[in-house]
A protein has these predicted regions:
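Short helix-initiation/N-cap motifs at beta->coil->alpha
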Residues: 147-157
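Short helix-loop capping/hinge motifs at secondary-structure junctions, enriched
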Residues: 1-9, 102, 214-215
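Detector for C-terminal structural segments
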Residues: 14-76, 90-93, 126-136, 158-285
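Short, well-ordered beta-strand elements
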Residues: 114-124, 145-148
């Protein structure tokens, strides 16, 4: 949609989702904010661009935001635990103004007098408690925002036909990314039903996907994906949500396991074993 073409608009909308309030009020403080498309992995971009990433991204400069080369990688700002973070609201209003929208009579309007509106489409009642406060914050910004909940069949049909503005979804990426990146981020899949939900079309991203698919070493792949992560985050195509960086498991304490477990796998069915001594201690209590 044309109204979301300016990345300033997309960034401003994202500023109005208060993760810290949601985490404290709704999630018992159990989660961390997602900041990366490859969160908590060796492929997550961090800080300022490295010399290795610069070598990859320099030839693509004309396709990507200048901020990639001048600023640290984008991380959503931390909000105060109050429902509305006034600092982020002021920043969001400034971004809208820079994109040609001004506050008039409590509404964000362009030079034609059109009011900025948006709809968040949802099919799960479980997400009402998350979406509704976000809607309220967007209204405080001067946006005519609404939350529409429909059944899953209608939802699937509307998503496939691109009849939506904002939805809730996940970007589940592989730890060994390759040709499947075309389905999620390539211009080739922007106009057809695919995992490229936002219809992303960027020649620089397309080139990075091709580089990743043809990487020959793990080190090379990691550098390319860090470059891709940095680039995607600069485009503000999402409002990052949350994740849990640890496994939470309840178990009877008669098992043992290796000191060093795989980084992303609990290994309960692969590496744990029944410990007779622990079982005897437990049974004697």
């Amino acid at each position: 949609l044309d109204k979301f073409n300016d990345p300033k608009i997309r960034e401003a909308i994202g500023l109005m989702f208060n993760f810290e309030w949601s985490n404290k009020t709704l999630f018992f403080g159990l989660y961390d904010r997602v900041t990366s498309f490859w969160e908590n992995s060796a492929m997550q971009a961090s800080g300022r661009i490295s010399k290795e990433e610069l070598a990859i991204l320099n030839p693509l400069k004309k396709y990507l935001p200048e901020s990639i080369f001048s600023d640290p990688v984008f991380i959503p700002p931390t909000s105060k635990p109050d429902k509305v973070d006034r600092k982020n609201r002021r920043k969001a209003i400034k971004l809208f103004q820079d994109a040609g929208w001004d506050l008039a009579d409590g509404k964000l309007k362009n030079k034609k007098g059109d009011i900025f509106s948006l709809e968040i489409l949802n099919y799960s009642p479980a997400f009402d408690r998350i979406i509704n406060p976000f809607i309220e914050n967007l209204k405080l910004l001067g946006i005519e925002a609404k939350h529409t909940r429909i059944d899953s069949t209608q939802y699937t049909e509307r998503v496939r036909n691109f009849e939506w503005e904002i939805i809730t979804s996940t970007y589940g990426n592989s730890l060994t990314p390759g040709i499947e990146l075309v389905q999620q981020y390539s211009s080739k899949t922007a106009d057809v039903p695919s995992r490229n939900l936002v219809g992303l079309k960027n020649e620089g991203i397309d080139i990075l996907i091709n580089l990743a698919a043809n990487a020959t070493t793990r080190k090379e792949l990691n550098e390319i994906i860090r470059s891709l992560d940095r680039s995607l985050r600069s485009l503000h195509i999402w409002v990052p949500q949350w994740y849990k960086k640890v496994h939470t498991v309840a178990y009877r304490d008669h098992y043992s396991y290796p000191k060093n477990l795989p980084p992303f796998d609990l290994g309960a069915f692969d590496f744990w074993w029944f410990d007779k001594e622990k079982a005897e201690i437990l049974n004697n209590k």
